[in-house]
Amino acid sequence: MGAFLSSANSRKHPWENGEALRTDSSKKLRMSVSLYEHPRLIPWLPDEISLQILARMPRIGYLKAKMVSRSWKAAITGSELYRLRKELGVDEEWLYILMKKADDQKLVWHAFDPVSSQWQRLPLMPGISHGGGECKRGVPGLRLGDLVSAGIRISDVIRGWLGQKDLIDRIPFCGCAIGTVAGCLYVLGGFSRASAMKCVWRYDPFVNSWQEVSSMSTGRAFCKTSLLNNKLFVVGGVSNGKNGLTPLQSAEMYDPATGVWTEVPDMTFSKMQALPTAFLAELLKPIATGMTSYRGKLYVPQSLYSWPFFVDVGGEIFDPETNSWEQMPAGMGEGWPARQAGTKLSAVVDGDLYALEPSTSDRGKIKIYDPQEDTWKVTVSQVPVGDFAESESPYLLAGLLGKLHLIIKDVDNTINIMQTDCLKPMDSPAPAAGMTCQNPDVSEQETDVWKAVASKNFAAAELVSCQVLRI
């Protein structure tokens, strides 16, 4: 018995001779080699879980997170993260503002994160060259940022139809349009050496870079864009004809899934066809002055133009179900508030259509469209918007986080973003207890309607346009 116990006790355990230690070391070596060859996003965690963690990060942190490792950069710039953020309901809305620098007239983009109240400057848009409406990248000294030049508006361009084409010839680029689809920004067309371009550029916020994509079928400048059913629609604008600039009634649609442009039926401009004489038909130019996606359709207000006058002639509605245009209700089209001659801004918030109407040099009105009564109603009678005669867009509207936002520039070159929680028409019943909406009839309460959410001085820069991206 004693011999048995002695024999049993004489057996050395693995840890006594270092066998387990060597085995442990070899395992660690094999695992480290495996991790080196196939590094995980987060050590010791499956990549599926790591991706869930990255997806829940605030977007503002992705720029720095991409520098952690190559695998993190690949994950953050991949489409799977975008899909996962949307699936988890953690995608965020950011406001992207396009500005024009006063010193060199270049376009610059700035993104605003309303959650962290931080700003991010986007990389400069790539260099381009022009040849017959087509674009090529990489020509030194020629940048997409030159597309809009000081003092050039749609009204200036249309004067070219009346024998003043040299105005466009003196400006290298102007008149690009912007839009959004599938979580990316798009810059479309514009002029190059008095020729309308077909080119389209896309900014991917995950990759943080610009890329040229499929060109439009027609060269356009000052066209209107809108998003509907995950497709980017483009209508109107001007192009080059046999006798100079020609207004366009055509439209086309871009599918980001296929990268293909498809033609859409032309707008009819029926009011143009009803003109009594051929002289008036030649003198008055049909212009699409805006476009917005509203109630599952595209709404395009229109005007007839003869320098220096614009005449509102209602508008048309595109129905994607029937693939056809129909006349816009009279009250909607003829009463659509105008920002300035040739341009009508609007924003849709929680299914309601809003527009800003400048009433005096330093005041404006916010109006909401009532589809039941086919009329525009004032919701705020005093909006502090400045009068900048040389500015293309002294103020902008945007629907962000379910609220209406007003972007304005003050005399000190400070860009202010103002937000309103709730707007009711002036003739609506008083809001229920606990609601924050103010009655626009009470002047002392007007200032309480708007809340300043951000301000930043961008030196001498003009507002051009804005878009909202949710990713």
Protein language model regions, located:
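Blade-level signature of beta-propeller repeat domains, shared across WD40, Kelch, NHL, RCC1
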Residues: 409-471
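Beta-propeller fold detector
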Residues: 121-127, 211-217, 262-268, 326-330, ...
